């Protein structure tokens, strides 16, 4: 699988739902849901996007939105270490550019604008040292739901709904 056809992203949105996806559909750079604009914004940095877009939710988005609502936020933003859209993390190892040509800028912009940032990519975040690269890129406090036995921040689908946040120790990676 290659990414020879680089294309600029397009934003698909309405008042409460949105996504930024490359024109060819290979990459999703940003996904969000808003339910109360008077409340703060919670961002999640996950591994890679799957099927969710401006109009379709997936289990990860629903779980992240559930946490955000439970903790008093009015918007959830999802960005990823790798922007390659795939339901199979093994595809990240096979693609020549799983990060995506514009991903770092979206990561920085979303995390800079969020009131709190949760990292939650699981053990595959060690691929090409990407987790370390992104934590160095982000100039804000980072939180995690928990960490794996490889000291990577756990994915939201593998945590109970009543999980508490903890400050993520960047040095553990």
Residue ranges and their predicted role:
Residues 92-173:
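Glycine/proline-rich loop-helix segments at beta-alpha junctions forming the active-site rim
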Residues 29, 58-65, 97-105:
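Short acidic (Asp/Glu) patches
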Residues 1-58:
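Active-site and ligand/interface coordination hotspots across diverse enzymes
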Residues 74-90:
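Short connector loops at secondary-structure junctions
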């Amino acid at each position: 699988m290659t990414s020879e056809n680089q294309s600029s992203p397009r934003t698909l949105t309405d008042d409460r739902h949105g996504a930024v996806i490359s024109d060819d559909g290979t990459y999703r750079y940003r996904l969000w849901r808003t339910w109360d604009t008077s409340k703060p914004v919670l961002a999640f940095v996950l591994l890679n996007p799957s099927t969710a877009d401006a109009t379709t939710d997936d289990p990860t988005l629903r779980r992240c939105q559930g946490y955000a609502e439970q903790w008093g936020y009015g918007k959830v933003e999802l960005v990823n270490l790798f922007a390659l859209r795939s339901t199979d993390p093994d595809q990240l190892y096979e693609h020549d550019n799983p990060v995506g040509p514009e991903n770092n800028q979206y990561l920085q912009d979303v995390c800079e604008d969020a009131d709190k940032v949760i990292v939650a990519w699981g053990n595959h975040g060690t691929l090409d040292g990407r987790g370390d690269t992104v934590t160095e890129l982000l100039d804000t406090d980072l939180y995690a739901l928990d960490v794996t036995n490889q000291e990577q921040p756990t994915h939201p689908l593998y945590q109970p709904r009543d999980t508490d946040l903890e400050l993520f120790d960047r040095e553990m990676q």
